[in-house]
Regions:
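Negatively charged linear elements and acidic catalytic determinants
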Residues: 7-56
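Soluble catalytic domains of membrane acyltransferases
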Residues: 47-183
Length: 183
């Protein structure tokens, strides 16, 4: 699996940075794996992040915007990518008092997915919605209760609209736009 990952990572890096030299490619790949390992290791401390014991390790920019969303009781669609520890975003939104549901794609590893679901529901965001038709009913129900939604938009999708991404046609999710239009 790691060999396959390396091929995909190198191909993607060369698509994004066609002039990258081998040294920079290897360095960037090492940094990527380093970040991936840190995020994985931070799950051990996710309870401490939730309980406020590690707040000095987190920097929030734009808290005043979140405070305004809460004050106005607005429903918002939060979009992000898998940057640093992406789980902390949903955790902070929920801890701030925003009624939040998070859309997720189940992990390929069924056993690990069950563990991650429990961790996410207990410490990150109580309302976890599985991506796809199965979670749609739950999402609609929560949206009608004025819940905001958090989702990562940097994953491969099987449906959407075709758009140019690094000069290649790629399916692009329309979920954020659909949520804003409908709710």
């Amino acid at each position: 699996p790691l060999f396959r990952s390396k091929i995909i990572i190198n191909a993607n890096m060369r698509t994004a940075f066609p002039n990258i030299n081998s040294n920079d490619l290897n360095k960037t790949t090492r940094l990527m794996w380093n970040n991936y390992g840190r995020v994985f290791a931070e799950y051990v401390f996710i309870k401490d992040f939730r309980n406020g014991k590690l707040t000095s390790n987190i920097q929030i920019d734009g808290q005043e915007i979140l405070d305004e969303i809460i004050k106005q009781n607005n429903q918002v669609v939060f979009i992000s990518g898998h940057l640093s520890n992406f789980e902390l975003m949903a955790m902070h939104l929920e801890k701030s008092g925003i009624k939040l549901c998070a859309i997720y794609r189940p992990l390929n590893n069924v056993f690990l997915n069950n563990i991650m679901e429990r961790i996410r529901k207990k410490y990150i965001c109580q309302y976890q919605i599985e991506k796809g038709l199965g979670g749609l009913r739950k999402l609609i129900s929560l949206k009608k209760q004025n819940f905001s939604t958090a989702l990562m938009i940097d994953q491969r999708v099987s449906e959407g609209i075709l758009s140019k991404f690094f000069n290649t046609e790629a399916l692009t999710t329309t979920i954020p736009a659909q949520l804003v239009k409908k709710f």
